[in-house]
Amino acid sequence: MKLTATFFSSLFFITVSFTQAQEATKTAKTEERNPDKFKQMYDLFATPNMYRTASGAPGPEYYQQQADYKIDIELDDKNQKLYGTETITYTNNAKESLDYLWVQLDQNEKARNSNSPLVESNKIDPVFSGQSFSRKYLEEDFDGGFKIEYVKDSQGKVMKYTVNQTMMRIELPEVLKFGEKISFSIKWWYNINNYTIDGGRSGYEHFEKDGNNLYVIAQFYPRMAVYNDVEGWQNMQFWGSGEFALPFGNFEVNITVPADHILEATGTLLNRSEVFTPEQLKRYKLAEQSFDKPVIVVTQAEAEAREKGFSTAKKTWKFKAENVRDFGISTSRKFIYDAMAVKTGNTTAMAISLYPKEGNPLWEEYSTRIVAHTLKSYSSFTFDYPYPKAISINARDQGMEYPMICWNFGRPDENGKYTDQTKYGMLGVICHEIGHNYFPMIVNSDERQWTWMDEGLNSFLEYLAEISFDPNFPTRKGPAKNIIPYMSGDQKGLEPIMTNSESIRQFGNNAYGKPATALNILRETIMGHELFDYAFKTYANRWKFKHPTPEDFFRTMEDASAVDLDWFWRGWFYTTDYNDIGIKEVNKYFVSNEPSKEVADFLKKRRRRDSKQGPMVYMIAEGSEDFKPEMNKPFKIFDYKVLDDFVNQNFSEEEKNKLNEPKFFYQVTFNKPGGLVMPIIVEITFEDGTTENHYFPAQIWRMNDQEVNRTFATKKAIAKIQVDPKLETADIDTTNNSWPKTIEKSKFD
């Protein structure tokens, strides 16, 4: 019967009623209720519409533009220049007409007249190397911006354009209506920067010993800006931090380089037999059938022989890529090349690595294996990897991603020795950058606006991939305890996750670490694996090859799980609040036939209003003036006549056998010095060493977000109560997490 479930909890009725009445007069002064903690997100979310629905899915009128490219480029290795021509075919799928187009010229961030250096605060450094002093104060600034030679329409007629730093507006001869296409051509060139000196996501690395260069080429062509239902034209300038917003399209790219170079790029290589030797071609075909280990396609001996040649002949590598948002290239004489096949669900792709001999033995041993593992792991949480390959390029000090290709740091010393830190650093960056194929290359969010939408989600999946690759992987992003130093820092130096990319001061913690931690807490602590994984996979599949916004993610996670997470998004993503939940006090109570003096007075008043009040059971607090030492002796709950009579009158023998018989009663007051509302996770340790765990959802704070009480009726005496015993909620102060209070050892002890 229903009474079974509620009977013993009613033991606290009188005490609780009395306490509430006693404190009624001071509630207004002590209770700090902030209803905004659980307020629904209508005030912050965009209104759902026919483009983006309230469920977080694309709406029936959702659209996105298409930009197709035919590109021919040539690399001048002697002078480090790149020359190119392209034809862009742009399709307007918006149900509105366009008067002009915006094209991104991100390379202009390195132009001599770039405004990017002018928006950074700087001071005089106390010490310089000769090279750094010369570059800062003596030499003319490097000019790495685009040199646009022409913009022409499909008939060869010059089109009018205006360049504003990293954006170029092309004026159309007539409006581009819904469903119409326009083709136009651009010719350009630029100086390739030495990124090891100038920094940046693209450029070349020079090897003094053999005189060769290793190129990682990106942002190398004028690229269409995004036009959508949220921003209109996303033509925010590229200042260097906020990365890219790009439409999907199809690419045909011909790349001419010295004949002795080995090259890889986005897309399918169409003329492999023309650029590989017969032996290399044979090895590559073996790699296509090797699912358990990489096959060396271009050997170290072949790479070392090419390093000495400096051929003046040329070769053109021809690529085709479908439904990608961008294109990246890497080329060098120095490259060793290995590959293996990897199956993800119903698709098979090639995992590929290119690296100079300076990367061995580390790269030959690990790179392609971690590429393959990453594809399998990420696909299990999202969708089968849809592209034909994923490439890891070894480039000094790099960590950058493009569709199907990425550049990654990590090399042993000159003697081929490396530490665990070097090894795991390399494995981590490869996993992370390969993972970007999913976010944002396929789930194509606006990086220029919201860095966390790709970096945060990717860092979360990276964490899952790393610990499945090696359970002892020293992963940095994901575990809740790792974000505590950031979240507990000076609030004046923090911004909410929902902050534009160019306004974030602690970029790594804000856009990578904190959102990754938030998602890990959702999965491990708040939603559970089953609900979280289904919702996350729903988001990935809804927005695969589309352009999601933050609201689309937030709404989908709730829509697919039936878990109200508005309180979580508001606290973790829209504020810099931190979590700090502690135990304020613990009071032990004992069953008594006699009320305390205060309760007796309370009951007299109550009985004046309720003459039918029958015999009662009373709870006496240990330490109160009514407490008697004999109350602490062993007893049976049914020794008390009121309880024994009640049970005999209301329960069958079968039901009585199922009743609990608690001997100890505790009231625990939890307080919350931190601003975040979070679940209360409690571990109780009994005097016999056994433990019991309790989980109270975050909604426990909805009526009072400063203090809440929970009661525990136990058969055994409690020796210790611990909040967040596994450190899974990013609680910044664990000194208030224990009862009895424990003194945490200093790192100096």
Set out the residue ranges of the language-model regions:
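A surface-exposed beta-strand-loop module
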Residues: 24-32, 72, 81, 91, ...
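Solvent-exposed beta-hairpin/edge-strand motifs
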Residues: 102-156, 260-261, 685-696, 713
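Glycine/proline-rich low-complexity spacer/linker segments in large multi-domain proteins
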Residues: 113-128, 189-251, 272, 727-749
